[in-house]
Amino acid sequence: MFKRILIANRGEIAVRVFRACRELEIEPVVVYSQADREALHVQLAEQAYCIGPARSADSYLNVNAILTVAQAAGCDAIHPGYGFLSENADFADACEAAGITFIGPSGDVIRAMGNKAAARKLMQSAGVPVVPGSDGAVDTAEQAKALADSIGYPVLIKASAGGGGRGMRRVYEPEQLIPLFEEARSESLACFGSGEMYLEKLIVNPRHIEFQIMADGQGHVIQLGDRDCSIQRRNQKLLEESPSKALTPELRERMGAAAVAAARAAGYVNAGTIEFVLAPDGQFY
């Protein structure tokens, strides 16, 4: 059990982690930007450190400042919450190098799952169903068009490094593919610094189903149930319903087993989410 944890976040998640630390009799240490000095998590804490000005890049994304505070305060772990540095592989590596536990997956796992084209291959090797599409990245718009012609339209162009709907385009007609591919690639380069793209068959009118998983680092992985995240705006979830009314007991069991297999294949440790697309015909990917 940890003795002292630095919470590298703000707002609701910082308060929730703070309360969890108190319940477990772990001493919480919080950080804040100059704009958040009156925030609730700061008011609750006995140890609170300013890590920079209001701009997130200079505070909550400032790896050196956060690690300096963690070491000075004698923290043996850092909880990143969500957003900010929670999926930053370099930060996870920096914590390990400093002898501080990063409460989350390792840097290698973050990198492996952060590249969606590589993650597709990993899931296929583990027997987890993936949406029909490219085997890895596609290098050119012409290659993407040839693949789309073979699997049939509509298709989905996706950025390997993408997220939040950026670097993604739906293509319904062959003549749309090349211009939309270049458009998606340009957006991906601007947003993520990578122009690597891949292609999938577009599942029309799907449900977005997630399974919560936990892995302890000793080979034990469990799933803790499902939630339906299909109500979205611009590819961002608005509401989650748990459990999903769309799943039969048999389908829920199969998807839960696939979620556990996916986490094992990735070598995932800690709490996490495995996301599925559920097609109208009951097939999941």
Tell what function each PLM region has.
Residues 1-285:
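N-terminal beta-alpha lobe that positions the nucleotide/phosphoryl donor
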